[in-house]
Amino acid sequence: MRPIFYKLRQLYRCNQNYKHHFKSNKGVFTVIKKQNTNNFIKPTVYKLNSINYGRCIEPFNENENIKINLKKITTWNVQELFWYCYKGNKINNIIDHIKQFDSDIICLQEVFESYSFELIVNNKYLKEKYPFYLTGTLANRFIIGENSGLLVLSKYPIKFHQFTQFHQTTFPDILACKGALYFSVGNTNFITTHLQSECPRIAKRQLQYIINESPFTNKTILLGDLNIDDACEELGLCNSNNMITHLWSSSKLDYILNLTNDVQLDIDIDHFSLENCSDHWPVHASFL
């Protein structure tokens, strides 16, 4: 019964978030339908006339001269799905680990529970350390489903480009608004995503699609839970990670990849105890 209670609470909080968003966001929210000859994936690309998306980040002057020197980035699937997140002190354990990261940008996946989302972005320590954040769509799929689960925390201003949602997926992802979030920090471009689970065939097609749809031509880093054990081979890239990132499958599912070969990265997996925390280990990358 407890997971069901948490799900009902999530739906209520999601409704409150939307009320807050449409009252407070000064940006004009538009949905642009993109035509695609590939019938397998029909994306919706969300764009704004400002950098705000969802109940999102602080506005900033893009012409303001802000010195940005990125040293380290992180991706982590935190498994905040309602079926798991009610157990023990899980979300606080996750926040405690995030506090210890020395990264400039942190990309999280599976931040599905709105209560968990609020605890992360409103945590006093994290708010001071990461004053900027960005999300994928906060809309729940089929009302009772899940949102995108994507959350980006940043020490520096974020420029939002687009969120491309996958509409044709399979179970269990058909119940979530999964997609790819494209953004920039300084002169470095990022794509963060969480691809189809339990079906590598679909995940690989999604991977190729979001790369083909990328607005970026240089200094582009892909990071997230790709749910593919051979993602580097799939993209024709040098394998930068030979260590497992997923506890139960003992697979390499989480990646930080340089797509344009103009950024040098040193990859490291943070193998701490995942008890009452997540089923994935964080992946860190230091800029060389």
Predicted regions and their residues:
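Activation segment
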Residues: F82-C85, Y115, Q162, C199, ...
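Acidic/histidine-rich helix-loop elements
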Residues: L70-N92, R141-I143, T170-L175, Q196-C199
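Active-site beta-strand/loop signature of hydrolases that rely on acidic residues for catalysis
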Residues: K72-V78, I94-V121, L153, F183, ...
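Metal-dependent phosphoester-hydrolase catalytic domains
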Residues: R2-E62, R201, S214-I221, L226-L288
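Soluble or luminal CAZymes and related metallo-dependent hydrolases
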Residues: Y86-I94, S116, D173-K178, R201-Y209, ...
